[in-house]
Swiss-Prot record:
Key word Secreted present: yes
The record's note on its domains: The presence of a 'disulfide through disulfide knot' structurally defines this protein as a knottin.
Protein name listed in UniProt: Beta-theraphotoxin-Cm2a
Biological role stated in the UniProt entry: Inhibits mammalian voltage-gated sodium channel subtypes Nav1.5/SCN5A and Nav1.8/SCN10A by shifting the voltage dependence of channel activation to more depolarized potentials and by blocking the inward component of the sodium current. In vivo, this toxin causes erect, elevated tail, initial partial ataxia, followed by recovery over approximately 1 hour after injection and the progressive development of shaking. Although paralysis subsides, the body tremors never cease and persist until the end of the experiment.
UniProt-recorded Gene Ontology molecular function terms: sodium channel inhibitor activity; toxin activity
One GO biological process term: envenomation resulting in negative regulation of voltage-gated sodium channel activity in another organism
Family assignment from sequence similarity: Belongs to the neurotoxin 10 (Hwtx-1) family. 47 subfamily.
Amino acid sequence: GVDKEGCRKLLGGCTIDDDCCPHLGCNKKYWHCGWDGTF
C-alpha cells in the first residue's frame, strides 16, 4: 500500500495494492485491503 490521502484502511474496498494504506495490500479474492505482512 501507499501513504496518500484517501488510502483505504483495513477491509476497505480496492482493486490494486496502491489503493490501500501502508502495510496493506489488495486481497483479490475479496477485493478489500488486508495486511501484507510488513511492519
